[in-house]
Regions:
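Short alpha-helical "packing" element that flanks the helix-turn-helix/winged-helix DNA-binding module
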Residues: 11-19
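Low-complexity intrinsically disordered segments
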Residues: 130-152
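Short Lys/Arg-enriched helix C-cap and helix-to-coil transition segments
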Residues: 50-66
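Short alpha-helical "recognition helix" segments of helix-turn-helix
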Residues: 26-35, 39
Length: 152
């Protein structure tokens, strides 16, 4: 268990992901062949660990917390150091990721492919459709608006 996976056990991560995808606790319990109480307890623990992981990541990076949602796996904040909005996400595929709002020069960036793959994986895991052949900066705008409930 590490910060990058929210200090969750594999079972807690699975249960949290099922709930994040919209499955009811009773359905998760049936699928995993355990009691609803077991699922309820595991979800409470998972949400607390994710909340603590998101807040710890914000604290380490000196990000002022504005909104946090452990069930959906995100923290919205502001970086005084970079003077920009910041989004910290938690997902089963990417773990903890920090995203700073900025005007990217994606075409000239060495990490273009890596950023694009990470953003597409984040969107796929959250059932958010993105257009094809966009730059990572465009994906990020659309994805983060969808995650935080903003407009884009």
């Amino acid at each position: 268990m590490s910060l990058s996976v929210g200090y969750l056990t594999p079972k807690q991560l699975l249960i949290w992901d099922c709930r994040r995808r919209g499955l009811q606790q009773a359905s998760i319990a049936k699928e995993l062949q355990v009691s609803r109480q077991t699922i309820h307890k595991a979800l409470n623990i998972a949400n607390l660990k994710i909340l603590e992981s998101l807040e710890e990541t914000a604290r380490i990076n000196k990000i002022k917390v504005q909104k946090v949602n452990p069930l959906r796996g995100f923290l919205l904040g502001y970086s005084s150091h970079f003077k920009t909005k910041t989004l910290i996400t938690f997902s089963t595929k990417n773990g903890i990721q920090i995203w700073y709002k900025h005007e990217g020069d994606c075409k000239n960036c060495e990490q273009l492919k890596e950023c694009k793959e990470t953003l597409i994986a984040e969107a796929h895991e959250r059932d958010i459709s993105l257009p094809e052949d966009c730059l990572p900066s465009d994906y990020a705008e659309k994805l983060f608006a969808a995650i935080t409930g903003g407009k884009k």
